[in-house]
């Protein structure tokens, strides 16, 4: 099964190779788990028939000063994770097709390259949200792009949603974050999202 889309000319023009020196990695706890998911996506990109085909992830791991052997991950594990990510990408594209002028909020973005894989149009506002140390690392290895903003905060902190205008349909992506939330925190987060945005999807 190959769910990887063909990269458009605009996406091909984007390169992460502007980083001249490797970036050190100092992460712990839940934030460190994002290294495994990034590496699995990079391994998938090397397959003859990739599921995700995330060449941005492959470029990103080359920018990090990290011994990937520490993860003890083999390529056979990659499909277990990339199938889920590819399905989320499909849902995002469907939402963007239905709402060309919209907002996307990606909770617990980690080092995921979704905004680059999707390459949303000029009328889409995209927010990637994660712990401050994660956002600091993203800023070092990924380029900026129009209508793209990073928010450095734990998802459970109240108030950060106020930074996001509520004037258009909004999609909340929460791939891989629910296991780190208590039931009360998860319910409270969803309620704040519902109260803030009148039209959207989770």
For every predicted segment, state its role:
Residues 3-4, 9-16:
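Short, low-complexity intrinsically disordered segments enriched in A/P/G/S/L with frequent Arg
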Residues 13-105, 109-153, 159, 166-167:
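Rossmann-like AdoMet
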Residues 44, 182, 198:
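Hydrophobic/aromatic-lined pockets within catalytic cores
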Residues 91-94, 190-196:
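Short amphipathic alpha-helices and their capping/turn segments at secondary-structure boundaries
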Residues 172-173:
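A conserved beta-strand element that flanks and buttresses the S-adenosyl-L-methionine
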Residues 180-193:
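A short, conserved alpha-helix within the catalytic core of class I
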Residues 196-202:
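Conserved beta-strand signature within the Rossmann-like core of class I S-adenosyl-L-methionine
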């Amino acid at each position: 099964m190959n769910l990887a889309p063909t990269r458009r000319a605009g996406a091909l023009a984007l390169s992460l190779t502007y980083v001249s020196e490797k970036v050190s990695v100092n992460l712990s706890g839940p934030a460190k788990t994002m290294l495994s998911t990034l590496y699995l996506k990079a391994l998938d990109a090397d397959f003859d028939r990739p599921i995700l085909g995330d060449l941005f992830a492959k470029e990103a791991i080359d920018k990090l000063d990290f011994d990937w052997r520490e993860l003890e991950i083999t390529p056979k594990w990659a499909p277990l994770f990339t199938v889920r990510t590819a399905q989320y990408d499909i849902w995002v594209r469907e939402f963007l097709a239905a709402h060309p002028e919209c907002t996307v909020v990606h909770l617990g973005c980690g080092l995921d390259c979704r905004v680059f894989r999707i390459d949303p149009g000029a009328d889409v506002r995209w927010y990637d949200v994660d712990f401050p140390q994660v956002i600091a690392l993203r800023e070092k290895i990924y380029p900026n792009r129009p209508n793209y903003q990073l928010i450095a905060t734990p998802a459970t902190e109240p108030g950060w949603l106020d930074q996001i205008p509520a004037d258009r349909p909004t999609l909340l992506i929460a791939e891989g974050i629910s296991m780190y939330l208590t039931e009360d925190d998860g319910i409270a987060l969803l309620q704040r999202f519902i109260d803030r945005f009148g039209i959207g999807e989770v």
